[in-house]
Amino acid sequence: MRMASFRPKYITFDCYGTLTNFQMAEAARDLYSEQLDEPRMQEFIRNFAAYRLDEILGDWKPYAEVVHNSLERTCKRNGIKFRDEAARVVYERVPNWGPHADVPAGLAKVAKEIPLVILSNAMNSQIMSNVEKLGAPFHAVYTAEQAQAYKPRFKAFEYMLDMLGCGPEDILHCSSSFRYDLMSAHDLGIKNKVWVNRGHEPANPYYGYTEIKDISGLPGVVGL
């Protein structure tokens, strides 16, 4: 599907999950698979994801606290002893994560024509390690730490738009997540959206987007 009639001023991206291979589930398995059978492990991973979302809906706090609190709550719910060291191990893995295999080539093609921007639920001290692995130049990288708010809060998106000096009508926002990105983008009037279907969440056509299976499909969306 193409949007050849619309050439955005910027293409804005979620990073973790959309571009970077987000490996929280793998980290949880490494820590707890010996204590949980497979059905319980899958439930633990679902709980961990849910608590991470819940932890970021209030006032901003460092991502290390988000990981710590969500892992502690998940362990409590699943009857597992929580250790501070486990949360530290998970947090320190984040900057080591690289891109999905489809990302570098797809981004590089688009970056030749349209400035690329990241809006990430990240810490300043971690995100550039991930960005450097993506294989394409970025016009700007904005973090939750800079915005003092995590997505899906509107404040994070508003910070990005203010920093770019543009309106919601000027960008194309690209994410694999409705709950973190595309729902808020819709509510804020970002009409041009791309859903990268990486299997994290089911389709939700109400929110109005172009679907691609991976970043290799992005150039075609903007007529490249």
How does the language model describe each region?
Residues 1-10, 39, 108, 117-224:
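Asp-based, Mg2+/Mn2+-dependent phosphohydrolase catalytic module
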Residues 4-101, 112, 125:
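N-terminal helical cap/lid subdomain that shapes the substrate entry/recognition surface
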Residues 25, 104, 153-154:
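Conserved strand-to-helix beginnings and helix N-cap segments that scaffold or border functional pockets
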